[in-house]
Amino acid sequence: MIFKKLEKYLKNIDGKIAIYGIGKETEKNIPEINEYVEIVGLLDGFRDNGNIYGYNIISLNKAIKIGIKAIIVIARPGSCRAIVTRIKDKCNENNIKIYDVYGNNLLEEKQSKCTLGKLKPYYKKDLMNKIEEADVISFDCFNTLITRQLFSRYDLFELLYNKLSLTEMSLKEFVNQRIKSEKSTAIGLAPNLKKIYEDCVFFSGIDFAEEEFKIDKSVIIRREELVEVLNYCINKGKEAIVVTDTYYSEKQIKSILNDNSIYGIKKIYASSEYTRGKDTGLFDIVKKDYPKKKILHIGDDYLSDYKSAIKSGINSYKIYSCEDLFYGTNFMPDVEPDMELDSKIKIGLFISNIFNNPFVFERLEKDICIQNNKTIGYSFCAPLIMDFVKWFEEKTRECNDCQIWLSARDGYLIKKIYEILYPNRKTHYVLTSRTAAIRAGTLSEDDIAYVDDMKFGGNMDLCLKKRFGIDVNKIDIKQIDDTQQGILKYKEIIIGEAWKKYLNYKKYLKKICEKNKNILFFDFVAKGTCQFFIKKMVPNKIKGLYFLQLEPQYMNDKQIQIESFFSEREKIKSTIYQDYYILETILTSFSPSVNEFNISGEPIYAEETRLKEDLDCIYEVQSGILNYIKDFIKIYPIEQLKINKKLDEQILS
């Protein structure tokens, strides 16, 4: 089906078009497209002659000579990008538009979504110059040297409520009491945490102050660039101190700093110890302690860190907190503070990672630039992958006594995540690939026809070799059936070879397969080809649990069961269909793809085509994803996680 966005364009086009792609989806879409516009021919990356679906296959140059106004690319998103890269220069030169079947303009450059246009820039070199002029460098603590992996400080109170399983009052009552008590005890002085809880109307028997402190410590991380500034100051012989508005004691602040490997602080001025804050005299005490020293204070709050320091005769330099940077961008504008806690934690992990560095203005542009592969995995990919694994586990709970098969190579990282989230669940990493499944599973003429529908970019000799593992130089010509057309000429040879590979593959699967247990089969993004052919090799019932199923209509007559994380309806509306190929690249293992199995049931791998730098990049992204998973469950129990695909997509896209 063509989509309304493309339909609108086709109605208004004044001229001819060509379609790029000769697969089954093209055949399906041609009649609808032809209702609106004249199709002059079909384009393909490997062929520029012949006829299919009633249209000539032509070259791009010929299409240009005919005078086409547009090209409609009917292919998967990853293929669309590769096609556009190949043809965009000629199309731009000849004013030819390129659209996909969804109506997206494929020549349109995507603009950066995340810019710092709202914020006034500052530069690290300016701060370092000010440091050179000072004797004592004072650092704010929270949001400066350290930050919380939370969307809001108030999320801490909800975490405390959940941890203590408080049923005597509602969450809202608890949070309101906690905030109200902090505000009332702060009037005229700087309270400590015990005093705040003493004024709360809570039942006794629990040390709320200690429990809150423990949770807070668990969600605090360093702001790396500012810790580097601190270490620079110490190495230059400057005296480093901390001046902080806090309800924690000096001892507790020191404990937090030590836990985050922040050392070398000569003195900590905690407002709770002096019963006064930065705006009520704490800086005056600092000034008095260093009467003849030039002091520079670094902090994130304009009033308490910048204005109050200057008022006390102390130079000050304001930096942005992670929260400042987040709200200063145009990223995810519809984030709401009243969303579910697990979603807020996702955003908190994102903010504390992406905006950890306060010195983001070193480039001329104000775009946020991610140059660390681990950050890509941690902040952008991990939330969606974690939610998928949670969904997958929920589906396995619906199946009594099932075995879990995580198919290669996409199942490699999924298995690692499973072992972190559900360490007591047994999973099997199953070696397979579309090539291995086809070579061992093509046992009938119908199977050959199914495989032949997947258009192959090469001649017959190459097709036989790559798809079926058959060396044309070793073929007995007596087995070639000249009464048939195309690939069916080699039917006898293909099926004969497949039976050998089938028996070898079965030996491998027998080592894994648990008798009398249904199989839940993971594939990431697929039509179902591997599952279809593997189903022939095991007696067990198989149900597929996919991230996304492509072209499900091709499996309608194959009697295989597949359920997807993203439904067909969601896929149409979702941006994930445009971006899944990125995730597919990331999930992979570090072994080459398996081609087939030997007589002992051992894998025979294809030649590795990825470069070392490609594998290094994948490793770093995967490390980021695994770190995110560990950080999330440290803060929030996976059992209570509610899947939020909308938020995951916002983050990824």
Regions found by a protein language model. Name each.
Residues I17-Y20, I72, S138, D245, ...:
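Short glycine-rich phosphate-binding loop at a beta-alpha junction
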Residues M1-K110:
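Hydrophobic, well-ordered beta-alpha structural blocks that scaffold small-molecule cofactor pockets
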Residues M128-N176:
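Active-site neighborhood of HAD-like aspartate-dependent phosphohydrolases
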Residues L10, I57-G67, Y123-K130, D284-K288, ...:
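Short amphipathic alpha-helix with an adjacent loop that forms part of the alpha/beta core around
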Residues N49-I52, I241-V243, Y247-K294:
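Substrate-recognition "cap/lid" segment bordering the active-site pocket of phosphatases
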